[in-house]
């Protein structure tokens, strides 16, 4: 089940496995999609939508639920739910599985941010999506 109106406090159990620490800011632009199965949050996607641009802040799926298409579906939901021109994200160059997923979804590497992470460079990736929306309206 997809939950698009998520209260951050409902994610506390999944954060036990998740290693990043966030100070969640009350923002009109921050959106959270979670994926719930058997009353348990097993994945979440944090993203900002500002006008025609979207930035994926983070994606996390519990290990036992990975490689089941959950992250791909959440990213595609952003495309379906918001009329944005593009989506950007940042990923560690060491996270080969994530890079492969993003490339499979049509993201392109556009920049490298040296020493962005404590143990690696960051790769900035971009997916152009606006033309797909226009195609829907034209045909």
Role assignments for model-derived ranges:
Residues 1-64, 72-75, 130-131, 138:
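Acetyl-CoA-dependent GNAT
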Residues 103-111:
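Conserved acetyl-CoA-binding loop of GNAT-fold acetyltransferases
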Residues 61, 67-80, 100-104:
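Conserved acetyl-CoA-binding loop-helix of GNAT-fold acetyltransferases
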Residues 82-93:
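Conserved GNAT acetyl-CoA-binding A-motif
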Residues 24, 112-116:
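Short, solvent-exposed loop/turn elements at beta->coil junctions and helix N-caps
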Residues 58-60, 88-90, 124:
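Short aromatic/hydrophobic contact patches that present stacked aromatics
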Residues 92-96, 115-139:
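C-terminal "cap" of GNAT-fold acetyltransferases
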């Amino acid at each position: 089940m997809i939950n698009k109106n998520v209260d951050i406090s409902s994610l506390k159990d999944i954060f036990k496995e998740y290693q990043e620490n966030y100070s969640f800011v009350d923002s009109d632009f921050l959106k959270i999609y979670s994926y719930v199965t058997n009353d348990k949050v097993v994945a979440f996607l944090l993203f900002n939508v500002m006008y025609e641009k979207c930035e994926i802040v983070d994606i996390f799926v519990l290990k036992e639920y990975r490689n089941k298409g959950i992250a791909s579906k959440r990213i595609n939901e952003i495309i379906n739910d918001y009329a944005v021109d593009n989506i950007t994200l940042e990923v560690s160059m060491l996270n080969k599985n994530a890079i492969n997923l993003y490339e499979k979804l049509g993201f392109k590497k556009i920049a490298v941010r040296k020493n962005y992470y404590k143990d690696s460079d960051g790769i900035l990736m971009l997916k152009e999506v606006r033309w797909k929306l226009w195609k829907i309206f034209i045909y």
